[in-house]
Regions:
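Alpha-helical transmembrane segments of multi-pass small-molecule/ion transporters
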Residues: 1-300
Length: 300
């Protein structure tokens, strides 16, 4: 219970600071830099060597691809029939196909399922969601904004991302028997800064700017992201014999609210950023309710 309370406190604190305390310029970028380049790699280096790799670990990764691929198919077909612009369609594919599997996923999964669940959440995020963002996400952003995707740039972005490098190192170290205890004592406290800082950063960036023509598109998007996508992932896991904590974490990661980085990508490619940020803000708030409820339904 105290872990869940920490999530709400950090999120609300960030929102209050952004509104009333006039934080220094660049604070969000500074926090995000630390989270992505220091805290997240440290967490990966701590947890991945402890993961027991078994055949079911394909599921959390596949769930991330299914969520994105389903969003691309659904909104790609739905957009023209509802008269959406290509920019609107691209924005919904990005923000409703990619979940907040790190900033929200890590702390929520850890609060609900402890370190074993967190290790699986890292697998879903680093082997699933991040490669989807850096590859298929860039392709969608390019296609729907009228730009040409650059495969070499995509490959370099994945290969040089600090947490991905840490993931590769962590897998090798795990195969060799794990870290010496002395190093574990270094990685753990650095990685522990991710949860409070990530949620504080989300609170600082929280935005809610609905327009009267956005509600329909936002409803379609969030209906997919928070309900249909996790349901399809659960069906996939059930029919393929996946169970236990692997199934639960995979489905919950698929059910996470929209990814902050996806909204940033939509903004960079001019894919209706106002809609993207509205869906992001509403989705984050709703997921704080739907994730615990989904966990109960899954028997967590």
């Amino acid at each position: 219970m105290s872990a869940m309370l920490l999530l709400f406190v950090c999120l609300i604190l960030g929102t209050v600071v952004a509104r009333f305390a006039k934080p220094p310029a660049g604070i969000v970028q500074g926090i995000n830099w630390w989270v992505l380049n220091v805290a997240l790699p440290a967490l990966v280096l701590e947890l991945i060597p402890k993961v027991t790799f078994d055949p079911q670990l394909w599921f959390p990764v596949a769930a991330m691809w299914l969520t994105f691929g389903g969003a691309w198919l659904l909104f790609g077909l739905l957009g023209p029939r509802l008269g959406w612009s290509r920019q609107r369609t691209g924005a919904l594919i990005l923000v409703c196909g990619l979940g907040n599997t790190a900033y929200m996923g890590y702390p929520l999964i850890e609060a609900l399922h402890g370190k074993p669940g967190l290790a699986l959440a890292v697998v879903a995020d680093q082997i699933g969601a991040f490669p989807v963002l850096a590859s298929a996400g860039i392709v969608v952003a390019s296609l729907y904004s009228g730009r040409a995707p650059q495969p070499r740039l995509i490959a370099r972005r994945i290969a040089t991302f600090p947490a991905f490098v840490a993931l590769v190192i962590g897998i090798v170290v795990g195969l060799l028997g794990g870290w010496p205890e002395l190093l574990n004592g270094v990685f753990a406290p650095i990685g522990a800064t991710l949860t409070p800082l990530a949620l504080f950063s989300v609170g600082l960036q929280f935005g809610f700017h609905p327009g009267h023509r956005q509600w329909g598109a936002a409803s379609w998007g969030l209906g997919w992201k928070l309900l249909l996508a996790p349901l399809l992932c659960w069906v996939l896991g059930a029919i393929t014999g996946v169970g236990g904590l692997v199934l639960t974490v995979g489905v919950l990661q698929a059910a996470m609210g929209p990814m902050v980085s996806a909204a940033i990508l939509a903004d960079e490619y001019e894919l209706e950023p106002t809609l993207a940020n509205t869906v992001l803000g509403v989705g984050i708030v709703l997921s704080l309710i739907t994730i615990p409820l989904g966990n109960l339904l899954l028997g967590g």
